[in-house]
Regions:
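Bacterial N-terminal signal peptides
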Residues: 10-22
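Kelch-like beta-propeller repeat domains
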Residues: 15, 26-350
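N-terminal secretory signal peptides that target proteins for export/translocation
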Residues: 1-7
Length: 350
């Protein structure tokens, strides 16, 4: 269950400090599926063709894993696929017409101290043939953005990167850098990019979802790309691609958090897990909350069994899968307590 056995005791201490989620019994709707073969944090989930694909992964020393796994709910089995061509982390991942798109991220600098170097790489993965294809690069280099699809185009929003004119090519917790409101759209039909109206609240590590051709960006991290005291936000903003405008602020997320898993189902956006750091604690969440854009209202759902951040999540049918992740907040003394847990929330369960 935990791949760093030396740190299991540390986890028990951390667990005692975790923020409590609403008082539901997770046994009511959550269940377990086949564990993830290579427990990792900073993995991203996307459903395509009735299967769940988990990509990415980050190990000790900020080493990107470039994992690609396919999960089949019909057989409850995982199959390893070809690794990502470029070993990067903190990606934006989405799917369109059965193809999976990976945008931006961070890599290790080739020289100098270990850090996060923002990239502009874009890739298309074809699950049917297990092949990768390089696409036109993003107009701007950034990591930890979020991506979704509206009307056949891919919107990549937010992220973290350097200040204009900075001599740094990478970012680090000890060096000044910034969150981004950048909004760029990719057209797969022409393999071209276009820059759109920036998001009013610059942020990264946010959840995103498209409902009725509008894009909702939820929570995330402001100020910089690394978890820090007060960096989480509860802000929810909506973008209308048809008129290239951002609307007024919407109902705030009840639990301000970043590095969550998420998925969209039946016109609602579900946000799961995440991490936090305050003056008195650092930890991860079990909380599960859903946002209904039609009513501009939040609801709480049964909590996960395991608190974690950097998990992969998405819906297959009416079941939300939340896979792997790190049970500790990043940046602390024991930052890689990874779990292979694959939890499933069945919205139709009674």
């Amino acid at each position: 269950m935990f791949k760093n056995k030396y740190l299991q005791y540390t986890f028990s201490i951390v667990l005692a400090l975790m923020l409590l989620a609403p008082g539901f019994s997770s046994a009511q709707k959550w269940s377990r599926a086949a564990p993830f073969p290579e427990a990792s944090e900073e993995v991203y989930g996307i459903a395509a063709g009735g299967k769940l694909y988990v990509l990415g992964g980050l190990g000790p020393g900020w080493t990107a894993k470039g994992l690609v796994y396919e999960y089949d709910p019909a057989t409850d089995q995982w199959i390893k696929k070809k690794n990502m061509p470029l070993l990067s982390h903190h990606l934006a991942v989405t799917q369109l017409n059965g193809k999976i798109y990976v945008m931006g991220g961070f890599v290790k600098p080739e020289k100098g101290p270990t850090a996060w170097q923002p990239i502009d790489n874009a890739w298309e993965y074809d699950p049917a043939n297990d092949t990768w294809k390089a696409l036109a690069p993003l107009p701007s280099k950034r990591g930890s953005p979020s991506a979704t699809v509206v009307n056949g185009k891919i919107y990549v929003i937010g992220g973290g990167g350097n200040f204009p004119g900075s001599k740094d090519t990478s970012i680090h917790p000890a060096r000044a850098h910034r969150a981004l409101g950048t909004n760029e759209v990719y057209d797969p039909a022409t393999n071209t990019w276009e820059t759109k109206a920036p998001m009013p609240t610059a942020r990264n590590h946010a959840a995103i979802g498209a409902v009725n051709n509008k894009i909702y960006v939820i929570g995330g991290r402001v100020g910089n790309a690394f978890i820090s005291r007060g960096s989480n936000t509860d802000i929810v903003e909506v973008y209308d691609p048809a008129i290239d405008q951002w609307g007024p602020l919407l109902a705030q997320m009840p639990t301000p958090r970043s590095a969550v898993a998420w998925g969209v189902n039946r016109g609602k956006i579900y946000v799961v897990g995440g991490e936090v750091r305050t003056n008195v604690m650092a930890g991860t969440y079990r909380a599960v909350e859903s946002y209904d854009p039609a009513a501009n209202r939040w609801s709480s759902l049964p909590s996960m069994e395991f608190p974690r951040h950097g998990s992969a999540g998405d819906f297959i049918g009416n079941k939300l899968y939340v896979v792997s992740g790190n049970v500790q907040s990043g940046g602390g003394p024991a930052t890689h307590i990874e779990t292979d847990v694959n939890e499933v929330l069945d919205l139709d369960a009674k």
